[in-house]
Regions:
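An alpha-helical interface "stripe"
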Residues: 1-183
Length: 183
């Protein structure tokens, strides 16, 4: 997968998303698909939660575009009716470059090249502390606290919809910016 990314700062795998957009929207031109990917990955927002909400709306509702002077049509990023038509990749140790450090979540689930789920798998030797350690790691990755500034890669979490922390047979989940107590 790293070979398909322009750099480790890029979290969405653009070639996969472009292919999916063209497959799901056969009327779409390659130039329009490339522009949609740029628009999705280059969103301007004042906070992680704002960018996450903008991305969520685009991914779930689609985006209306006008192409070649034709009336507006809605572009789909995913096939919700036939999920098997989507490109699903589950990868481990998905490196993302932050300002000062790389982050490397244990498992990342990508659909059509878009990271949607991040999992942290903790050792049972941590005992009851596994949950706190995993959630703290998510907080650092997202830079949710001043003490984590420049130690994470919040761009990854603009598209991520679910965070899962697991240890053996136990698991908890949350969404972007979820406080510890709600996992």
């Amino acid at each position: 997968l790293e070979a398909e990314r322009g750099s480790l700062r890029e979290t969405v795998i653009a070639p996969r998303l472009e292919r999916a957009l063209l497959k799901l929207n056969p009327w779409l031109s390659l130039d329009s698909a490339k522009k949609l990917v740029r628009d999705l990955t280059g969103l301007q927002a004042s906070s992680l939660i704002e960018s996450s909400e903008k991305v969520y709306n685009k991914l779930t509702r689609g985006v209306a575009i006008e192409q070649d002077g034709q009336p507006s049509r809605n572009v789909r990023f995913f096939d919700f009716d036939e999920p098997t038509r989507n490109d699903l990749v589950v990868t481990r140790q998905y490196s993302v470059k932050g300002v000062k450090k790389h982050i490397r979540p244990d498992i990342v689930v990508l659909v059509n090249g878009v990271p949607l789920v991040v999992l942290e798998c903790k050792s049972p030797t941590l005992g009851e502390g596994w949950k706190l350690e995993a959630i703290d790691q998510f907080s650092r990755y997202q830079e949710l606290d001043e003490k984590y500034r420049e130690l994470g890669a919040p761009r990854l979490f603009e598209t991520v919809q679910v965070l899962v922390a697991s240890c053996g047979q136990a698991a908890v989940y949350g969404t972007v910016t979820t406080p510890h107590r709600y996992y």
